[in-house]
């Protein structure tokens, strides 16, 4: 109900989303497993492209928005985390920061701020994570989306 009131409703999402549970009568898995349509995921991407704002209204508090796309204060094998915020993976394209969400099966919501570009990819397979912590195919999908966006311009 809270997500519907605070996020889904204001974004004008077309369909209800739902979170998976750890078992049928169990707890919601807030760390993953959000099910929604590609269009509605695209709205989340656009919300993040626009610094948490939608139609001139701040939906996600700016402080939280910024913190969520900043590396979380975590360590990975003794090294400081530089690639994950709050539900957002952090990377670079052409030395510019980007952020993206990724699903278990190759779903992506990618935000490329310096190109004013958001895209959603649904899928059934994702490549293995490379040494930088990102699936190799995310960069392939980014290249395709950038090429398509350039053709449209």
Residue map of PLM features:
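Active-site Gly/Thr loop motif
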Residues: 14-22, 66-120
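Non-transmembrane alpha-helical segments in soluble domains
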Residues: 3-4, 8, 42-49, 65, ...
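Active-site-proximal alpha-helical segments within enzyme catalytic domains
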Residues: 32-53, 107-123
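Structured C-terminal helix/loop/strand segments within mature extracytoplasmic catalytic/sensor domains
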Residues: 103-153
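Active-site helix/loop module of the DD-peptidase/beta-lactamase fold
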Residues: 1-31, 36
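Structural helix-adjacent loops and short alpha-helical linkers that scaffold large soluble proteins
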Residues: 1-4, 52-61, 77
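Sec/Tat-exported extracytoplasmic proteins
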Residues: 6, 10-15, 38, 45-52, ...
């Amino acid at each position: 109900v809270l997500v519907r009131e605070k996020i889904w409703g204001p974004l004008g999402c077309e369909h209800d989303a739902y979170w998976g549970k750890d078992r049928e009568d169990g707890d919601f898995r807030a760390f993953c497993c959000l099910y929604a349509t590609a269009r509605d995921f695209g709205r989340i991407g656009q919300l993040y492209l626009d610094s948490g704002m939608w139609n001139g209204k701040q939906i996600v508090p700016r402080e939280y928005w910024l913190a969520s796309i900043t590396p979380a204060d975590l360590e990975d094998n003794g090294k400081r985390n530089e690639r994950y915020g709050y539900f957002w993976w952090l990377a670079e394209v052409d030395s510019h920061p980007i952020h993206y969400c990724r699903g278990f099966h190759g779903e992506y919501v990618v935000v490329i701020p310096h190109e004013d570009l958001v895209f959603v990819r649904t899928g059934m397979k994702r490549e293995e994570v490379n040494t930088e912590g990102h699936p190799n195919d995310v960069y392939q999908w980014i290249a395709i989306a950038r090429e398509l966006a350039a053709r449209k311009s």
